[in-house]
């Protein structure tokens, strides 16, 4: 039934995504992280103390985000339908494909309507960089980078952990990833507090990021890309990012679409140089945002198909 639960959760995300009316667990995880930071900063003042606080936050969030779903499912383990209903709902809340598509395509529609100011504003909701003065090409690049990176973080990774350990594992991953997105910055405020959150997130994304890269490469035909070229670009440029993981999905996407990603961006008023990823075979055009969304969905579908075939073949032994 684990396979059925995952398929239903994926279909739910396809259909309705993250409705605003639903009490999303990530909201409460985020509130807990903010509370731990606020209280912790009152007691941990030194750089070493802040690093220790970061480690304590990691433990608290990992235990809480795993423990609560585990206890909920354990309490209803004798009720078949309630158990699987809750497992499906919890897994569904960890998946972000539909919301990523919606947010990414808001930028696309603004560019299609030649409203660059609107595109900058919509982009600012989903990226950490300063979007106020971005050109159209820079907006497109940022949107594609976000979709490719979050194909790994927001789609493939939670699926991977759900396949290993159901909703508790998927939710624990989501807690760790949320913690990294809130604390894992290398600026003056978070360089010490965010050290362990960032490192732990890197560890948890190590395998999913590489799986994502492979799946994106294999999905190349869906956008008339070349599988072999995609793998070559991904493997060549896999280290062209400060993160040990991000260049895999971004490199795969760049290889599939024949574009160049990376380069200098402005974060919190500071210019941050990043090596380029991919080859500029094509100029960046807003229609490529649609291609990146197609690659995200194709990768997710391929992941589920491979898992289904694996489970089925194992059960037939």
UniProtKB/Swiss-Prot annotation:
Stretch forming the signal peptide: none
Q: Specify whether S-adenosyl-L-methionine is a keyword of the entry.
A: no
Q: Where are the transmembrane segments?
A: 20-40, 56-76, 80-100, 152-172, 203-223, 292-312
* Location(s), subcellular: Cell membrane
Superkingdom of origin: Bacteria
User: Biological process GO terms, please?
Assistant: cobalamin biosynthetic process
Q: What is this protein called?
A: Cobalamin biosynthesis protein CobD
Q: Which organism is the protein's source?
A: Clostridium tetani (strain Massachusetts / E88)
Q: Which gene encodes it?
A: cobD
